[in-house]
Amino acid sequence: MSGDGSPEIEVDGSGLRVAVVAARWHAETMDGLLAGARRALEASGVTEVTEVRVPGAFELPVAAARLARAGHDAVVALGVVIRGGTPHFDYVCDAATQGLTQVAVTTGVPIGFGVLTVDNEAQALHRAGLRGSREDKGAEAVLAALETVVALRGVAPLPQG
């Protein structure tokens, strides 16, 4: 859901329990991502929201797994990883992406992927939903997760237990 080709999504999320897990690194960008996520949740009618903060993107999967298993209908993961001069960027991006994918597949709970993997801070800020930003990835991650919950409920609801 990036750039000019992103779909227009409106989802009725009333009655859904949603968790947002957000990293702390890159505070200005994270403030924008969280604000966008909150706006999208409110606009979609979601009133039961749990927010959890973790140190960085590497910690997102374990928190997302715990929240998914705690009965949330969807989990939204927000973070920022900015490329540096070492392979650390690749390791963290891969761990976050693979970890969040594993959580979604093993739990059956949709994960909204709002982890920015960028080359520099300017790219992150342009995607953070701040005044003057080109994109609002926090909101997009929420809408993707909610739309997936609604789509799956119609064809393959999770067993209650």
Curated annotation (Swiss-Prot):
Gene3D superfamilies: Lumazine/riboflavin synthase (3.40.50.960). Keywords: Riboflavin biosynthesis, Transferase. It comes from Kineococcus radiotolerans (strain ATCC BAA-149 / DSM 14245 / SRS30216). The active site is at 88 (proton donor). The gene is ribH. (2S)-2-hydroxy-3-oxobutyl phosphate binds at residues 85-86, 127. 5-amino-6-(D-ribitylamino)uracil binds at residues 25, 57-59, 80-82, 113. This is 6,7-dimethyl-8-ribityllumazine synthase. Catalyzes the formation of 6,7-dimethyl-8-ribityllumazine by condensation of 5-amino-6-(D-ribitylamino)uracil with 3,4-dihydroxy-2-butanone 4-phosphate. This is the penultimate step in the biosynthesis of riboflavin. Its EC number is 2.5.1.78. Pathway: Cofactor biosynthesis; riboflavin biosynthesis; riboflavin from 2-hydroxy-3-oxobutyl phosphate and 5-amino-6-(D-ribitylamino)uracil: step 1/2.
